[in-house]
Amino acid sequence: MCTGLALETKDGLHLFGRNMDIEYSFNQSIIFIPRNFKCVNKSNKKELTTKYAVLGMGTIFDDYPTFADGMNEKGLGCAGLNFPVYVSYSKEDIEGKTNIPVYNFLLWVLANFSSVEEVKEALKNANIVDIPISENIPNTTLHWMISDITGKSIVVEQTKEKLNVFDNNIGVLTNSPTFDWHVANLNQYVGLRYNQVPEFKLGDQSLTALGQGTGLVGLPGDFTPASRFIRVAFLRDAMIKNDKDSIDLIEFFHILNNVAMVRGSTRTVEEKSDLTQYTSCMCLEKGIYYYNTYENNQINAIDMNKENLDGNEIKTYKYNKTLSINHVN
């Protein structure tokens, strides 16, 4: 599961982030990698050297960093979301192509490119390969949302047919089916409105709304990918932007909280609870990574620009899931 979101504030800042909906912890922490840093996979000997500094949520496996979402020093953000059934990775490298292991795709994007347009150009010759980070750890079925400080966003999906790159003017991504299906599905909700429905005369009977919100009657409320896509797309569009960036930051979290999963509400066939482990929000211009967790609603912030971008080591920040309460008496 998972939901991705990108939006622009009234002052022209760009916020990008996601809900991480998963039934288990993956030992995640916030990871900072300086520019010009060489990452070497001990298992398959593949290497990657960062052109740009990277900050995001992920895990380090045998000294090699992998990311669920993050951004780089140039204001390019990327998030990987579950994409079951439809995804089809290449089984082997293709000669003449840029072959990218699945686990490395997000880091490859953030380490090498400064804009969505640069990524789109590079993807014209890319091949996403089903090479795991380790023989004991299979790849996750993923598609990716990528956004930058120009406000442009794309979705990258590798299916049986080809590697698809969609322009994302909606600013939202969830899971399967494919992104173009979700966009077409928006047409089913053309009748939704943000304003209250006026009184209606049904023959001689006057019908009056009994409460606010009648304009969005029919907005889906379940946790399926299709319903979450619709709900976030409309809430994003309805959002009233504020003169204070801090308020828009809070609005970002409120939108994603509207599709956050409560423990027990969404159970897998194995009776495990799919829940929103964390919500992230990155200010792409400022280089600040904000997040809160299922156990702790307090917003945490890590500022990339307070780190040494030319450092010589990876730095991690502990994932904060300890409940914090502001006692006022």
UniProtKB/Swiss-Prot annotation:
Organism: Clostridium perfringens (strain 13 / Type A)
InterPro entries noted in UniProt: CBAH (IPR047711), CBAH/NAAA_C (IPR029132), Ntn_hydrolases_N (IPR029055), Peptidase_C59 (IPR052193)
Amino-acid positions noted as binding deoxycholate in the UniProt annotation, renumbered to this chain: C2, R18
Residue numbers annotated as active site: C2 (nucleophile)
Name assigned to this protein: Bile salt hydrolase/transferase
Entry keyword annotation includes Metal-binding: no
Catalytic activity: glycocholate + H2O = cholate + glycine; cholate + taurine = taurocholate + H2O; taurodeoxycholate + H2O = deoxycholate + taurine; glycodeoxycholate + H2O = deoxycholate + glycine
Pathway info: Lipid metabolism; bile acid biosynthesis
